[in-house]
UniProtKB/Swiss-Prot annotation:
Function: Protein S19 forms a complex with S13 that binds strongly to the 16S ribosomal RNA.
PANTHER family membership: RIBOSOMAL PROTEIN S19P FAMILY MEMBER (PTHR11880), SMALL RIBOSOMAL SUBUNIT PROTEIN US19M (PTHR11880:SF8)
HAMAP family: Ribosomal_uS19
Coiled coil: none
Family, per entry: Belongs to the universal ribosomal protein uS19 family.
InterPro entries the record matches: Ribosomal_uS19, Ribosomal_uS19_bac-type, Ribosomal_uS19_CS, Ribosomal_uS19_SF
Protein name: Small ribosomal subunit protein uS19
Keywords: Ribonucleoprotein, Ribosomal protein, RNA-binding, rRNA-binding
Domain of life of the source: Bacteria
GO terms (BP aspect): ribosomal small subunit assembly; translation
Gene that encodes it: rpsS
Molecular function GO labels: rRNA binding; structural constituent of ribosome
GO cellular component, one term: small ribosomal subunit
Classification via PROSITE patterns: RIBOSOMAL_S19
Length: 91
C-alpha cells in the first residue's frame, strides 16, 4: 500500500542535508547513504548516490524516471549464481 499523499514523501533528514549540500556546491562526488527507505526526490536528479546493499555501496545515477521510487530498489541485496547443474545430465 503506498504512502498517503497528505503525509508526503519520506526521506531521512541526514540524506536530505547531504543532497542539498551537493546541489548547492555542484559537487559530482557520490553521496554515500545507508538509507534504502528514502524516496527519490526531483532535486536528486543528476546526482550519483551510493546506496548500501548490505556489503558495499552501489553507485546509482539518478534520472527523471526514478523520481518517486525508493533508493533501495536500485541496489540489489541478493546475488543469483544460477542453479546447480545436474551431475548425471539430462536424459
Amino acid at each position: 500500500m503506498p504512502r498517503s499523499l497528505k503525509k508526503g514523501p519520506f526521506i531521512d533528514l541526514h540524506l536530505l542535508k547531504k543532497v542539498e549540500a551537493a546541489v548547492e556546491k555542484n559537487d559530482r562526488k557520490p553521496v554515500k547513504t545507508w538509507s534504502r527507505r528514502s524516496m527519490i526526490l526531483p532535486q536528486m536528479v543528476g546526482l550519483t548516490i551510493a546506496v548500501h546493499n548490505g556489503r558495499q555501496h552501489v553507485p546509482v545515477l539518478v534520472n527523471e524516471d526514478m523520481v518517486g521510487h525508493k533508493l533501495g530498489e536500485f541496489a540489489g541485496t541478493r546475488t543469483y549464481r544460477g542453479h546447480v547443474a545436474d551431475k548425471k545430465g539430462k536424459r
